Regions:
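Flexible, glycine-/basic-rich loop-and-beta segments that form/coincide
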Residues: 2-62
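C-terminal target-recognition/interaction regions appended to catalytic cores
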Residues: 63-219
Length: 219
């Protein structure tokens, strides 16, 4: 993700700035040991999760369909799937049910710009867009900040919003991480429930957290 983060690091004695220096210096080695090369674009991250590869009934919500795995076409996808051999159905890869008119708006959003920019109704670029702003993703670009609102993004090659699993991939959750609970919720329920999209969006990306842990352990 192209995401700004605020990191506060404190140390009793020593040089606190050393943490950030080590974090930056360790990045290339950290990725190399996992067979990864930065930057990782959207298609590299979620290209094997496209709807075109097939659908089955969702294991946890029978009224919905769940996507299945497509062929691995990047080192990142291989790394995300390395612990789930023999599994055909990704956890939390449930497709939303959108009305035909909504799908038409998604299709117009997909061709409205060559860049992954946030498009708002005031820009008058997309007919029928009523939401405050939507970002149509581009397969060859780095993803903007993953949010807890599913319809903030439109998929780069299919007229739909992202699934929880696709958001999780963009956050660097490996596919063996199982999300549970409701997919979305609203209103007063948000005070007592944490739906899956929010679980993903509010998390510290696991790969980043692992790198931080390695640096801290070495200080």
């Amino acid at each position: 993700q192209n995401r700004k983060r605020f990191i506060l690091f404190a140390i009793k004695g020593g040089k606190a700035e050393l943490f950030f220096e080590k974090l930056d210096a360790n990045k290339a080695t950290f990725l190399k040991h996992r067979g990864l090369i930065a930057p990782i674009c959207v298609n590299d991250a979620i290209g094997d999760l496209q709807r075109k590869y097939g659908e089955v009934q969702s294991p946890d919500t029978p009224r919905f369909n769940n996507g299945v795995y497509g062929p691995i076409n990047s080192a990142y996808q291989k790394y995300m799937r390395h612990n789930i051999t023999g599994i055909d159905i990704p956890n939390s890869h449930r497709f939303a049910q959108s009305k035909p008119k909504t799908v038409e708006v998604f299709e117009r959003l997909m061709v409205a710009s060559n860049q992954a920019i946030r498009i708002t109704p005031k820009m008058e670029m997309v007919e029928g867009l009523k939401k405050r702003g939507v970002t149509p993703l581009k397969g060859n670009c780095i993803c903007p900040t993953v949010t807890s609102i599913p319809d903030d993004f439109v998929h780069y090659s299919e007229p739909r919003i992202l699934t929880v699993r696709e958001c999780a991939r963009l956050q660097s959750f490996s596919d063996d991480y199982v999300f549970q609970g409701k997919y979305t919720t609203g209103g007063a329920r948000r005070k007592i429930e944490v739906p899956r999209y929010t679980q993903v969006a509010n998390a510290v990306p696991p790969l980043f957290a692992e790198q931080v842990g390695i640096v801290l352990r070495g200080m």
